[in-house]
Amino acid sequence: MTSRFSKGGILINRKKKLSFKFNGKNLFGFSGDTLASALLANNQVLIGRSFKYHRPRGFVSSGVEEPNALLSIGSGGSLEPNMSATTLELFDGIEAMSQNHFGSLEWDIGSISNFLSKIFPAGFYYKTFIKPRFASVSYTHLTLPTTLQV
């Protein structure tokens, strides 16, 4: 573990080593670690892909507000999706898998959309029916009414 501090961390028991799997790779951490801290200590920075465009995601915070730390825990019939890695305490033998990728996490097929980022900038779908102005007459009547009249 090259990314771990050699001292500190009053909640971590460095005498009790725990093994776990992330995407099939055998890794290890210590008792008192969260799954997120153990992944970071094992130099696992990429933990998932964005839902829509498959852009790489990593940890940005350490609490319950972390948006990118959702992993699938378990295997087979006991698979539990969308578990937060920042709040899940590490235990021996846990199996964690990243989400939202096709193929391996590092070589995601869906990430081909990165090459089309000039065509699809962030928020492009919010501007779909704004221009041209003269055409707005033809599609404004397609919107549903906000209130129902009885």
Residue ranges and their predicted role:
Residues 129-138:
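Helix-enriched interaction subdomains in cytosolic or periplasmic regions
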Residues 20, 38-41, 45-48, 60-112, ...:
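Iron-sulfur (Fe-S) cluster-binding segments and ferredoxin-like electron-carrier domains
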Residues 11-23:
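Eukaryote-biased recognition of intrinsically disordered, low-complexity regulatory segments
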